[in-house]
Amino acid sequence: MASKSGKTGSSGRFGARYGRVSRRRVAEIESEMNEDHACPNCGEDRVDRQGTGIWQCSYCDYKFTGGSYKPETPGGKTVRRSIRAALSEDEE
């Protein structure tokens, strides 16, 4: 008798279609998307995705734009860091 394999995750809905690498990428993206994200306004881990690039905190109802699958993109982090560095140089 066949033994039951492990859980397939969110990409298990595709079955054997689309290839292993594509299904794995979808599973990674969806797991990151559904993690707890901190609100940039209040700091609570209650941010939910409303649509493509639209995120909303369910605690303070702060709505903001971000990446399609993450509230903050790597490029956005870089820009924020460079703005902070420029502001700290002006203060000195």
UniProtKB/Swiss-Prot annotation:
Any Pfam family the entry gives: Ribosomal_L37ae
An annotated GO cellular component: ribosome
Keyword Acyltransferase in record: no
Note on cofactor: Binds 1 zinc ion per subunit.
Keywords: Metal-binding, Ribonucleoprotein, Ribosomal protein, RNA-binding, rRNA-binding, Zinc, Zinc-finger
Xref: InterPro entries: Ribosomal_eL37/eL43, Ribosomal_eL43, Ribosomal_protein_eL43, Ribosomal_zn-bd
BP-aspect Gene Ontology terms: translation
Molecular functions per Gene Ontology: large ribosomal subunit rRNA binding; structural constituent of ribosome; zinc ion binding
Zinc finger (C4-type): 39-60
Amino-acid positions noted as binding Zn(2+) in the UniProt annotation, renumbered to this chain: C39, C42, C57, C60
Cofactor(s) it depends on: Zn(2+)
NCBIfam families per the UniProt record, alphabetical: eL43_euk_arch, PRK03976.1
Function: Binds to the 23S rRNA.
Family note: Belongs to the eukaryotic ribosomal protein eL43 family. Putative zinc-binding subfamily.
HAMAP family, per the entry: Ribosomal_eL43
Subunit architecture: Part of the 50S ribosomal subunit. Contacts protein L2.
Protein's recorded name: Large ribosomal subunit protein eL43
